[in-house]
Amino acid sequence: MKFSMPSWGVVFYALLVCLLPFLSKAGVQADDVDSYGTVIGIDLGTTYSCVGVMKGGRVEILANDQGSRITPSYVAFTEDERLVGDAAKNQAANNPFNTIFDIKRLIGLKYKDESVQRDIKHFPYKVKNKDGKPVVVVETKGEKKTYTPEEISAMILTKMKDIAQDYLGKKVTHAVVTVPAYFNDAQRQATKDAGIIAGLNVLRIVNEPTAAAIAYGLDHTDDEKQIVVYDLGGGTFDVSLLSIESGVFEVLATAGDTHLGGEDFDYRVIKHFVKQYNKKHDVDITKNAKTIGKLKREVEKAKRTLSSQMSTRIEIESFFDGEDFSETLTRAKFEELNIDLFKRTLKPVEQVLKDSGVKKEDVHDIVLVGGSTRIPKVQELLEKFFDGKKASKGINPDEAVAYGAAVQAGVLSGEDGVEDIVLLDVNPLTLGIETTGGVMTKLINRNTNIPTKKSQIFSTAVDNQSTVLIQVFEGERTMSKDNNLLGKFELKGIPPAPRGVPQIEVTFELDANGILRVTAHDKGTGKSETITITNDKGRLSKDEIERMVEEAERFAEEDALIRETIEAKNSLENYAHSLRNQVADKSGLGGKISADDKEALNDAVTETLEWLEANSVSATKEDFEEKKEALSAIAYPITSKIYEGGEGGDESNDGGFYADDDEAPFHDEL
């Protein structure tokens, strides 16, 4: 499929103009700002959450009722009450089946997703399938209840809202919430739904590394800088490469693994000690949720200690069957158990550099975000990758994301001091539709700044086609069948016309939250249909996103050949149809050639189309090109006679016939 993309400079300028009304103080309507009140910024994390607010040009990260500025993303149900945060986590070991954590690993996903199935094996609480989606089952007040991941997340968001309301002394109704950069549309939609359940209007979903870059960039806005944000949290990992200059934050590329973080490191240690304990005592503690819960709590503490010490002792009284647990964990052993996971974090770093075309020596700063970046080995590997360049430690890795979210919240609510900030985020996967031959025609490329809008004209594939099917895909492969179907709809009522004549304008609108709206508009009749891709349309899981990018690289040569073959086929088919139509045009070419020449051309076109029908699947790119040359060899001498025969010597191809090197323009067919 041939289509042109605007230069990045034009895209950047257009997006800057597009974004300013949303992000500058002047662009927010006064009435809207008044109705917003104070907008808060929330980092809804896998293991911990954090909330901030901007007042008077300064960001405050708010402490909870325990005096801590980070709150565990835990929800627990007892016989009498529901607990959220520290209170829930503190009783987890004694109430493992009714204490919910890591809910971010389930939100927006399907029950049958591989990652969900892998995770629920390790959760002490029960997860069951309800209408294809995972729900948690708890027992409270003498009865069993089920909750969706959105509901559990809403309980955590409500806790963060309450912290802000206690600080502000007034009601809070609007928020900016962060998500991992590689969260897909379903996960983003589910996060917004959680906000609604919590009584919050989520004005903007912001990618976590982008939010962290805002926190970093406020003090570094003079000269242009390329920075890598390395965000390794409790359950997810993101890397983004950004350009910051004069308050403009442009995301150049993003990559990551939404299933890699501190909890995975903990699990390796837990697995090691469980195996050791079972062998030593000839028991099996794997099925005892309370025992594993106690070990999980202490292993997390030990991991934190090892960031500043070379070894630590783990002591647990009445660990199992009255026996105590006492083992030493060294930093060296912790690193040995997790070294492959640590090294795995470097692959997305390589990916963003490759995608953006930036060399690692041109990176000005590396910003560390997330508690897991405190692990010395992680810092060492990253420093080695960047040839000795040390990471910036000017911001608190636990609070940076909430800080950036609070700044963005301040922008949206018209706070002083943030008028000049412009945020240019990107979409993680290419978006397009299926066209003739099963090819995915791209409309919005991967790593395009959002919000963005892209339109392209398509046409019908057969004569008198009254309906076109618009199938929307995301992914990096040439053929749509190898990508992920997001949704489909039909545009009906197209008036009868030869193939290629109707003009169907397809428009993709991707908003600042990464949510997609697709419209098909028949320019002839004015009819249009629209679909918004929401969380029930089956967006991708994180593993599928990584697989698509890897497969796209692995099969790049194969994909290129397939695309070239289909283009050659389409070129031949359109050339033949264009020739037939113009021979039939009595006011044009058809009225200027002899009956014998007309018959010769029609016979050649008919033979070509019959050959196409018989060989379209098996023929190679070269076959299609040779067939087109053969048809052109018959057509060219006939059309040349027009100009040699006294038609005024006009070389403007009067009559509308297009020679081989001046092919009739045509739109991709639906």
Curated annotation (Swiss-Prot):
Please list which residues make up the signal peptide.
Answer: 1-26
Specify one Pfam family. HSP70
Asked if the record carries the keyword 4Fe-4S, the reply is no
Location(s), subcellular: Endoplasmic reticulum lumen
One molecular function GO term is: ATP-dependent protein folding chaperone
GO-annotated cellular components: cortical endoplasmic reticulum lumen; cytoplasm; endoplasmic reticulum chaperone complex; endoplasmic reticulum lumen; membrane; nuclear membrane; nucleus; perinuclear endoplasmic reticulum lumen
Prevents secretion from ER (motif): residue ranges: 667-670
Q: Provide the top EC class.
A: hydrolase
Q: Where is the composition biased (Acidic residues)?
A: 647-663
Q: Which GO terms describe its biological process?
A: chaperone cofactor-dependent protein refolding; endoplasmic reticulum unfolded protein response; ERAD pathway; IRE1-mediated unfolded protein response; protein refolding; response to unfolded protein
Can you tell which superkingdom this protein's organism belongs to? Answer: Eukaryota
Report the main location listed first in the record.
endoplasmic reticulum
Q: Which EC numbers characterise this protein's activity in its record?
A: 3.6.4.10
Region Substrate-binding (SBD): what ranges? 407-507
Query: Which reactions is this enzyme annotated as catalysing?
Result: ATP + H2O = ADP + phosphate + H(+)
Family annotation (InterPro entries): ATPase_NBD (IPR043129), BIP_NBD (IPR042050), Heat_shock_70_CS (IPR018181), HSP70_C_sf (IPR029048), HSP70_peptide-bd_sf (IPR029047), Hsp_70_fam (IPR013126)
Family of this protein: Belongs to the heat shock protein 70 family.
Q: So what does this one do? A: Probably plays a role in facilitating the assembly of multimeric protein complexes inside the ER. Is required for secretory polypeptide translocation. May physically associate with SEC63 protein in the endoplasmic reticulum and this interaction may be regulated by ATP hydrolysis.
Q: What protein name does the entry list?
A: Endoplasmic reticulum chaperone BiP
Q: Which organism is it from?
A: Yarrowia lipolytica (strain CLIB 122 / E 150)
